[in-house]
Amino acid sequence: HYIFYYEKYLRAGKMGIPLGVFSGSTLPRNVEAYYEATISNDLFLEGLSAVQDFFNGNHFNSSTQGESLASYLDALNTLKNGEDLSTLINDQFNTAKNMVLDLSAFRAEIENSNPPTSMLLAYDEVQKAVPMLKVDMVSAMSISIDFVDADGD
């Protein structure tokens, strides 16, 4: 559910769909909290922080840190192009976070820019983490992903 949340709810739901990445035209009314237009970025950033905290084993509402996906990748000594994979993933999360921090409210970005280039560039940075999580991380851990939901789950 972790990768599914990141890819479908955070990346696609909060950014990609309103940006029109999947439909070809922007859908500003699909921005989260459309009528409270100034908080969409905060909601996105909160979700991204939760994803990164989970990745790093940071406990909710606490300074406690435990075992994590990052610590497992580190224990496996997982490298990508000679660099530590957990560091690359964290760096990508940070890059995406910084790009979103530089944006106006999502609704304003979409409604006032045609195309909303700055937000599309931020979306691209969010997207770059998907193959790192979905391909590199799960491959290193020798696990498979199945997003099919079956009866009896």
Regions found by a protein language model. Give the residues of each.
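Mature extracytoplasmic or organellar-lumen-exposed domains after removal of signal/transit peptides
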Residues: 1-153
